[in-house]
Amino acid sequence: MIDLHVHSTYSDGTFTVQELVDYALEKGLSAIALTDHDTVDGLDEIMEYAKGKPIEVIPGIEFSTEYEGKDVHIVGLYIDYKCETFKTWLRDFVDSRVTRNKKICIKLTEHGCPVDYDELVKRYPGAVITRAHFAAFLMEKGYVKSREEAFDRYIGDNAPCFLPREKVTPKDAIRIISEAGGISILAHPVLYKMSDARLDKLVRELADEGLIGIEALYSTYTAGDVRHIKSLANQYNLLISGGSDFHGANKPKIDLGTGHGSLEIPDEILTELKKCLAYYVFSDMDGTLFDEKCVFSDALKDSIRGFVERGNVLVPTTGRPYKGTINAFIENDMVLPDMKVICSNGALIIDVETETPVIEFKLTSEEIREVIKKADELGIYVHSYDDDNIVLREETEETRFYTRKVHMPLKFVEDIADELKDGALKLMCIDLNNKPKLEAFRTWIHENMGDRLQGIFSNDRYMEVLSVKAGKGNGIKAFCKLNHIPIGRTYACGDQENDIDMIKAAGCGVAVANATAEAKAAADVITKDDASHDALKPLFDSI
């Protein structure tokens, strides 16, 4: 059994982190997550104390957020709490809490209960001061006789000394948890006392923002509550989490691991959540992963296979159509287990084993016709694709140049739009000598069809026309949402303009040494070597 929602004296719990570990061992738990309110101060201590003991301690946090005027809590599990971005964001957030607590001290003093802020902090060293601490302090000073009286007379939501906390939105919390490589969980949704419709709206919106899981097992839930939350999880593709919300003496009826006595959180829940912890490399192919001959070196093959064997995932993310993508991996004997690819510049995500589209964004037949009509006026070559072929009207110099690297059969038709009545993932526009002409064509597309279509350069000769919903960056976001991947566990690697949005979308954007200046400017890291010299080998070796 496990418990993925536990508090210590570093926030409003009464057990020290060492006492928590010892008690969890006494109760036979295999794992606990320390999720103190808005602080990670206890994590170093608890991780160190748990070393060598037969229990896993998961680094976590519980963020207090606000949604439409209501407190909503977001738990983060497996966060990289030493990540500089996370530390800076949390420090700024905590500083705002300190300011608020000092103002509450002034208000209490004005209402006849003198409270010195420095004395309060010394009384609870290392803790994030909450109203629970204020209530206990007021009792110690003899200003009130009970916690309830402290809230009713002074610090409750409608009491004279109350000040609202500096809050973030659930979206903010999900984003910062994801950027820190963590798993975001909507905590105890039943406690928010929302109507079914409003709770459904909350869960739907947070799932759209990248929420990974929901607390479906909790100390106070009824069997009906569990069924309801599991149904929401299934509806919105969320993983299940569970926790007691143990606080020690501050919630005396709730015990670690078992809540009110009947709570059971099986290890299998953690097994599923841990599947989110793999690292993903989304890599462009031509000019990034491949050399000029579209061949993997043996050394790069070994690095990629080792990366995958360690539980990580390579997702080819390319402008190529699917057949042109998978054929290149077949020719290199590099088809990987459970492989998925993002192709046609993010217009298609496909499962290689089943060849089943997971997500696709198509141009309509009417849009194809309109684009080709304008291309013909400008004297620009255009072809498209069906599932297996390059669809074109005639073979030209541009066709021969394109098929040097993309090995697919040619299907000749009189009218491309008529042939592709169900639409197409993209149109490929080629001019081998006149990029300004392609740029002018792209401008026309954006001015006349920009609400539906976009033009993206994959190199100086190729301009691809896609749905505005496509693009490699959007492809990565959709892939991560579908597969419960924290952005902080993603890398995106590229070299050209059509790679820039994915370089920006990933947790770490990588430009290879031969990339354009614009791609390098968008990246967090620039490789030492170019694509012809195994640019990404050090990345695969390091993860």
Residue ranges and their predicted role:
Residues 197-210, 321-341, 437-454:
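Substrate-recognition/cap helix-loop segment adjacent to the acidic, metal-dependent catalytic center
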Residues 275-285, 302-305, 309:
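Non-catalytic pre-domain segments flanking phosphatase-related domains
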Residues 51-204, 269, 368:
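Extended substrate/RNA-proximal surfaces in nucleic-acid metabolism proteins
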Residues 277-280, 297, 463-543:
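Mg2+-dependent phosphoryl-transfer enzymes with acidic/Ser/Thr/Gly-rich catalytic loops
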Residues 1-70, 154-156, 168-175, 180-235, ...:
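An N-terminally biased module of ancient metal coordination in phosphate/nucleic-acid-related enzymes
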Residues 33-35, 183-190, 304-327, 345, ...:
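Substrate-recognition element of Asp-dependent hydrolases with the DxDx(T/V) motif
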Residues 124-191, 374-493, 497:
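Conserved acidic, metal-coordinating active-site core of Asp-based
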Residues 45, 62-98, 298-399:
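Active-site phosphate-binding/coordination module
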